[in-house]
Amino acid sequence: MDRKRRFNLTDEPWIPVASGRISLREVFSRADVTGLGGSPLEKIALLKLLQAVAQAARTPRDDAEWARLGTEGLAEACLAYLEKWHEAFWLYGPAPFLQFPAVARAKLLSYGSLLPDVATGNTSVLFQSQKEQPLDDAQKALLLLVNMSCCFSGKKVDKSVALSPGLTKGASGKAGPALCALGLLHSFLMGRSLRETAWLNLLTQKQVAQDIYQDGVGVPPWEVMPQGEVDDVATALTRSLMGRLVPLARFCLLEEEGIHCVEGIRHPDYLQGGMVDPSVTGDRSAKKPRMIWADPQKRP
């Protein structure tokens, strides 16, 4: 694929909402956008990204500073941040957003193979909606984001490619940290607009310091990308809030006809030091944490 810069996520409409699609800039500049579209996995991944942008733009010290900041203050900070880091949000280019050009040697998968509602390989097509369709750039961006944290376990990832020297990978890729084994239940505070939602879910420095993130808020990966699965940057992501919001559980590279995908950073889960996303529901009061699993047959 041509590695010229194109499709900047700050400017291009790619985020599904009721009225169509909007850009990252519009999330924080428009007060009339009330909610996200897409599947549950897409909504979770998008809300985590919006929180990551918000935390990077402005993490208040405490509740009092959070209240003074308000929706408008956070929106202004996020717009300034997106302008400052505009070059980091190109979906295609020499340094594509949340991607690893070094995995180009991994096998090329069809995009449909990473979509849970699409039948590929020897899976039977029962409904027309399950047939694989070409994806546009907006859909590819969304698929990439979902696979950072909500990827499924299995053998579709290429185990033969590792970016960290000497690292050996198992036959099956681990499920993303936002899912774990059975599908974690996520809960978010929802505002009257998407930018108010971002403010309501914004954590303070005091809250982060009291929780389970050894390295605090941390640095978002689009500012400093790891060069391997277990280097210093990757290790820091396993210990920070940013690493839970954008965990890079898969190392991917988008191509015109498909996607290169290998297992990325293996994050500890709730049984390994109690590490969880800030949005998951569970009981950590006992010695062994107990998580609530998503059940479509039950209403949370």
What are these language model-derived features?
Residues 1-127, 131-238, 246-248, 255, ...:
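Conserved small-residue
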